[in-house]
Amino acid sequence: MKFTIPANAPAKPFHKHWQFCVGSGHAAMAMRTDYCEQLKQIHDELGIERVRFHGIFSDDMHTYDTMSTVMPMPGSEQVPFYENSFRLPGLVYDNVLKAGMKPFVELSFMPSPMAKRPTRGTFYWKPCIAPPKDEAQWQAYIQKFVRFLLNRYGKEEVETWFFEVWNEPDLKTPFFDGTQEDYFRLYEITAKAVKAVDNKLKVGGPATSNSKWVAAFVDYCKAHDAPVDFITTHQYAGDPISEVCDQKDADHMKDTAEIQAEYKVDFTQLFAGLKPEDGLLPMFRRTMPDNTETDDLNRDLLRDAAEQVQKQADGLPVYYTEWNGCATFGARGNDTRKVAAYDVRAALSAEDFIEGSSIWCFSDIFEELHPFPEEFHGGYGLVTQHGIAKPLFHALRLLGQAGDKRLELPGALDGEVSVAAFRDAADTQLTVLATKQNLHHFAGQSTPATPVEIEVELDAKPQSVQLCRIDEEHGNPLKCWQAMGEPEDMTPAQVQQVIDESAVDYAPAPYEYADGKLTVKTELVTNDLAFIRIVK
């Protein structure tokens, strides 16, 4: 397969929207030293500017405590005394700022004493996901929180932050015990409370899964004079909980409760052959299969959804505050180059429709379901619990370094094998990315290599040509870990060994130059990535 990069290819600014933000485990995680070290690594090496997490108001942050939450003895719920403090959120945001980043503030979830119902989400840390029982009390709480931030960090700093109301309110069981109307009302009173303290603060939503509710949300805000500065939503290629939105009308989706009601499983059959001592991960993987491996999903889903959402947003900037190749926690592909190939291609294809985005998430220091002990357990992170960089980390680092201009190559991203090209501002260096992307990664491991020929029109022979690959042998920490026997409790020496053995960098590459054309040849198997750097 041959691709040509013409000398006169027009260039446009390369919009690295994934550097806007990154997702994270819940707020309390940001008080861990290892979390903070990895967050700084993500900022310093990938250039990511913000971090977003759930649960800044959850009970483990102790922002609103009563006698019944502190000392739940019989009759304590009748005692009227309470304590409202944002000391722990302050420690969390202090750590974010020390890492060189800014918080993308997700206003979630509900302090349980303030909730209309005691509904808990399905997470390991059990957040309260009900709406407030007293709207005036909630608004006063939000206003006090905003004043706390302004006092602690200053008006000039906080006005650069973003405030997003809740997370995925369309998913009733894990995130919001209410209707669409309930969420819209919650958004309205919350946004108005924020603006009442400082009208320059940026507030937005609806923070839905699968690009849903945007048109209805915009209409509601207009009808109720609810302030909204930006639109947020989420999109995964495969999602086992809420169904994949692979349609132009992003509003008409099944309710999560309907999907779960249809989900029937015979656990006796499901767990046949497993032994209790095998641990939780094999059981979990059978319970939540990775549908990116079994279903024929749209490789252009993020682009198609973002294009539609941009139209529905009615001129407001669109931020995808969660996205990735797979929403299945524990999926084997999350530790492999499969997600790297998908995310890089998706980021490039959706570039024109997204103001900023946030890959979910930066680290396997993460406790939504359970803190799995295996170093490679299919977590969402760019790095493992011990900070070992996964293939997606390497891919984003290389893509971020590719240049500030992107060459316009119509149709070059359309096929399974695709290319993109970038140059620096001075036009002294050109980087070409070639990849063979397919979500059926494990089924496609044995596919034959595809020969790829890159032809670049150049006025003169280049000073150097270098190649950096992410494939089965390069940038594959999972393979290194497996080769050492899959140690569960890794020593510092073992961690460093995997880091060293899976590091990737550019090396001289063979090429031909004749008649004003540079030719580089390589081969790609499923989900390989090849970065070619040409110094003119």
PLM regions: where:
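Conserved, mostly hydrophobic/aromatic
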Residues: 21, 96, 145, 163, ...
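Carbohydrate-binding surface patches
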Residues: 414-461, 466-486, 523-531
